[in-house]
UniProtKB/Swiss-Prot annotation:
Associates with the 50S ribosomal subunit. This is GTPase Der. HAMAP family: GTPase_Der. GTPase that plays an essential role in the late steps of ribosome biogenesis. It comes from Leuconostoc citreum (strain KM20). Pfam families: KH_dom-like, MMR_HSR1. GTP 2 binds at residues 182-189, 230-234, 295-298. The gene is der. GO terms for molecular function: GTP binding; ribosome binding.
């Protein structure tokens, strides 16, 4: 199940980030702490009462010189588009302002649950002064103090009551779920539109069960069925926040959550940026199958070595994605786009691959015969046996006499031998070393 999304919106200086940080940092256990995105706290995975969810601090979307109203609109549009539950924050110290009314009116157009949190209610006496906020027309309100952590438990209890039922989630029914991610302007939308063009049969647009995203199902001439996740979001135009880097990262994280295979799009003209590596790292850490797509290849002056040189650059910059195949395409001319569905299917097959224990142990023992296990202070690592315990990604447990004797380099050696013996192109594999009891 994809984690529900909670967005925090409100006019400036009402304490949105304080509430966000308090909820994410103290009152809620952070499930995973990723560098970069959680550093600026735009998007934080979190948990409350055994519900896992993701929080968006829309205040992280900054539009620079854009007028105030446009910045507020960007926040609210982001919340309405992406969230399952919206928390509007106002300030109990200042009372209802015209800007609060602007935000509330924008939220009227959504049928998603909106919860009003009146912040800066730092003592019980202040509760008597907050009833004017009912005039915003958002129903029940929750007095809280972000700076003191007061009232957040009640607020979160109300939030999780609105989360969708796991039972309502769509079944994948054998279709391969994949997403196309990348920085703004690398050509994601062009690739999406080309792949959903006349040579594809659109079976249906599936309404997302936990948000308004549209997942597009299509079949190839070979009869393979795919679900391209959140194509509605990729194809939107004219949103004021569409080209902000933080929004791009946030959308990529959501796509990773909802997909089995990730197509990471790079721009051949612009080259590789830090954000490319940042987002790719999230997909790798999540254990998703990966394909690297280099778009705008038609715009590059080439000789007989250009493609190989660019591939070497990718391998150098994305050392952790050495398993990901690279495809050079042009959404403008259609070059090689017809090959993408088959490659997605191949890496998805590898992502789901199971290896019998007997075959796996033959490979492990052959590897040890070629390169004996390491020793430390006269003690030699002994590998007893290995077995596969999971797929998506393929995960193997290796039982040894002492975990401390398994050096990283030898673990990497065994992983490489497993990859040589079995085709795991496109998928990370996990090795877990355990001491045999």
């Amino acid at each position: 199940m994809a984690a529900p999304v909670v967005a925090i919106v409100g006019r400036p200086n009402v304490g949105k980030s304080t509430i966000f940080n308090r909820m994410a940092g103290e009152r809620i256990a952070i499930v995973e702490d990723k560098p970069g995105v959680t550093r600026d706290r735009l998007y934080a995975p979190a948990e409350w009462l055994n519900y896992e969810f993701r929080m968006i601090d829309t205040g992280g979307i900054e539009l620079g010189d854009e007028p105030f109203l446009a910045e507020i609109r960007a926040q609210v549009e982001l919340a309405i588009d992406e969230a399952d539950v919206i928390v509007m924050v106002a300030s109990g110290r200042e009372g209802v302002t015209a800007a609060d009314e602007v935000v509330a009116k924008m939220l009227y157009k959504t049928d998603k649950p909106v919860i009003l949190a009146v912040n800066k209610v730092d003592n019980p006496e202040m509760r008597q002064d907050i009833y004017d906020f009912y005039s915003l027309g958002l129903g029940d309100l929750f007095p809280v103090s972000g700076s003191h952590g007061l009232g957040l438990g009640d607020l979160l209890d109300a939030v999780v009551k609105h989360f969708p039922d796991e039972a309502a989630e769509q079944e994948d029914d054998g279709a391969i779920r994949f997403s196309i991610i990348g920085r703004p302007n690398v050509g994601k939308s062009s690739i999406v539109n080309a792949m959903l063009g006349e040579d594809r049969v659109i079976v249906s647009d599936i309404e997302g069960t936990t948000r308004d995203a549209i997942d597009s199902r299509f079949v190839t001439a070979e009869g393979d069925e795919f679900i391209m996740v959140d194509t509605a979001g990729m194809r939107k135009r004219g949103k004021v926040y569409e080209n902000t880097e933080k929004y791009s990262v946030m959308r990529a994280l959501k796509a990773i959550d909802n997909s089995n295979v990730i197509l990471m799009v790079l721009d051949a003209e612009a080259g590789i940026r830090e954000q490319d590596k940042h987002v790719a790292g999230f997909a790798h850490d999540a254990g998703r199958a990966m394909i690297i797509i280099v778009n705008k290849w038609d715009a590059i002056e080439k000789d007989g070595h250009t493609m190989k040189e660019f591939e070497n650059l990718i391998r150098s910059e994305f050392k952790f994605l050495d398993y990901a195949p690279i495809m050079f395409v042009s959404a403008k001319t259609g070059q090689r786009l017809d090959r993408i569905p088959q490659l997605v299917k191949d890496v998805d097959d590898n992502h789901r691959k199971r290896i019998s224990s007997s075959t796996l142990n033959d490979v492990i023992m052959d590897a040890i015969a070629v390169n004996p296990t390491p020793t430390d202070n006269g003690r030699r690592l002994r590998v007893y046996y290995a077995t596969q315990v999971a797929i998506q990604p393929p995960t193997f447990v290796i039982f040894v006499n002492d975990v401390e004797l398994m050096h990283f380099s030898y673990e990497r050696f065994l992983e490489n031998k497993i990859r040589e013996a079995f085709d795991f192109t496109g998928t990370p594999i996990k090795l877990i070393v355990r001491a045999r009891k």
